[in-house]
From Swiss-Prot:
Top-level lineage group: Bacteria
Protein name: Amidophosphoribosyltransferase
GO CC annotations on file: cytosol
Domain Glutamine amidotransferase type-2: from-to ranges: 29-254
Length: 495
């Protein structure tokens, strides 16, 4: 595909592992990059990815650069499963790029793990991508016309990397090549790209997926790029600012230089990052998302009050909103569900009795807290409703006399095509049923959702600055019909 021009050392091993779906929108991916000569960049990236583990649990990878030599290790599994200290010690360099993955385009297989590493005339590049393109068929055709047809993976991320490498091989530098390649790409992308020269961070013209800049305070600043500020905190970096929508930052030994993409548009940060995906200790718009989620809980209590004895949240994502609901309503807050944080994928089949009570592998109710009580249970979203029904049944079995559910987001009625894995529209319960019908199906005494107006009002920002297509179907980037049919949209054309 491209002439080899560097020493590419792949340190990969592992086997494919099937994906899975929960009764929630599945996380986006996490990206991390660091330029820090004389630092242990692989270890710092490991810890950064550890903080971003919630954004993707299927695979993890790190690529480090020592001049034109790149060491890349990636595999299926959690960050702690993929990397051992001995491996990290082998991965020396002045800069690193890392990724945690949940598949939104391309299936869950080892070959699709990132970073994607490619050779170019200027040396290798390693690309980590959070987001989803919506024009992969057109991009593939455009690359085929340039002679780029031998793809290794089934991901749109590799296609972006190929497009950049192609532009560089035609004579452009790293920044020019990246900007030119991205004119071919439509959709959501936050990219961190490692090169022998430095690291590049870039967000799509709408800024749908997040990307922030941090700095390690030394005599010479060492820059960090990450999906969320929590990844800066874990390595002791200081938050500087957000990479703006349509901005490219180039970090080298000379420092950080900002560039604009050829096309810019109104910023449209995914509002689900605020509600659910990003960690509550991450900062957006100068406040923690914990504070925002408490605020939407307070607003929810004002919009949809109900008389009850206790307010509780579904761990962990429903807790901040539940605390806010409690504060606004004056109804005491209590922990009524205990979460087993060590439940992961298992290949051991449960018994039929366990399947019937399957939620208790993850959440177990406190009977002495719930018995004889009227309960308000707060959660961040309902997608299919199956888990919600199991939780409600468990609460009733524990002695709750009434169960009222409050959801700190509007009904999810449309799938996401910009880097979050939601079900197709016919599988979304709120696209098929009214609120009253959903309440009956999940067996609650009452059900209410936060209004779209309330959700956006609580951001404190202009409502036009957020993508809320999953709630209203207004997609800021046109989604072709072919893309709407399947999240694994590259599988059929790369077999």
């Amino acid at each position: 595909m491209f002439p080899p021009s560097s020493d590419l050392t792949e340190l990969n091993d592992g086997q494919p592992l099937s994906g899975h779906h929960a009764d929630k929108p599945e996380e986006a991916c996490g990206v991390f990059g660091i330029y820090a000569p004389e630092e242990a960049v692989a270890k710092l990236t490991y810890f950064g990815l550890y903080a971003l583990q919630h954004r993707g649990q299927e695979s993890a990878g790190i690529a480090t650069f020592a001049g034109t030599t790149v060491h890349c290790h990636k595999d299926m599994g959690l960050v702690s499963q993929v990397f051992q200290e001995s491996k990290l010690n082998e991965m020396v360099g002045t800069l690193a790029v890392g990724h945690t993955r949940y598949s939104t385009t391309g299936s869950s297989h080892r070959v699709n793990a990132q970073p994607a590493v490619l050779p170019t005339r200027l040396g290798p590049l390693a690309l980590a991508h959070n987001g989803n393109l919506v024009n992969t068929n057109q991009l593939r055709e455009a690359l085929a016309e340039r002679g780029c047809e031998d793809f290794v993976t089934t991901t749109d991320s590799e296609m972006i990397a190929v497009a950049i490498a192609n532009e560089v091989d035609k004579g452009k530098d790293w920044v020019e090549g990246t900007i030119a390649a991205l004119t071919l790409c439509a959709g959501a992308y936050s990219l961190v790209i490692g090169t022998p020269e430095g690291i590049i961070g870039v967000r799509d013209p709408h800024g749908i997926r997040p990307l922030v800049i941090g700095v390690l305070e030394e005599e010479t600043p060492r820059y960090v790029l990450a999906s969320e500020t929590c990844a800066l905190d874990i390595i002791g970096a200081t938050y500087v600012r957000t990479v703006e929508a349509g901005e490219l930052v180039h970090i080298t030994e000379s420092g950080l230089v900002s560039h604009r993409l050829a096309e810019s548009a109104d910023r449209k940060l995914c509002v689900f990052e605020m509600i659910y995906f990003s960690r509550p200790d991450s900062v957006v718009n100068d406040e923690s998302l914990y504070t925002y989620r408490m605020r939407i809980g307070k607003h929810l209590a004002k919009e949809s009050p109900v008389d009850a004895d206790l307010v509780m949240g579904v761990p962990d994502s429903g807790i901040p909103a539940a605390i806010g609901f409690s504060q606004a309503s004056g109804i005491p807050y209590a922990e009524g569900l205990i979460k087993n944080r060590y439940v992961g994928r298992t290949f051991i089949q449960p018994t039929q009795h366990m399947r019937e009570h399957g939620i208790r592998m993850k959440l177990n109710p406190l009977k002495d807290v719930l018995a004889g009580k009227r309960i308000i249970i707060v959660d961040d979203s309902i997608v299919r409703g199956t888990t919600s029904r199991k939780i409600v049944r468990a609460l009733r079995e524990a002695g709750a006399t009434e169960v009222h559910m409050r959801i700190s987001s509007p009904p999810v009625t449309h799938p996401c095509f910009y880097g979050i894995d939601t079900d197709s529209q016919d599988q979304l319960i709120a696209a098929r049923l009214t609120v009253a019908e959903i309440a009956e199906q999940i067996e609650v005494d009452s059900l209410a959702y936060l209004s779209q107006e309330g959700m956006l009002l609580c951001t404190g920002e202009d409502i036009s600055h957020f993508c809320s297509a999953c709630f209203n179907g207004r997609y800021p980037i046109t989604v072709p019909d072919a893309v709407r049919r399947s999240k694994l949209m590259l599988e059929n054309i790369t077999a």
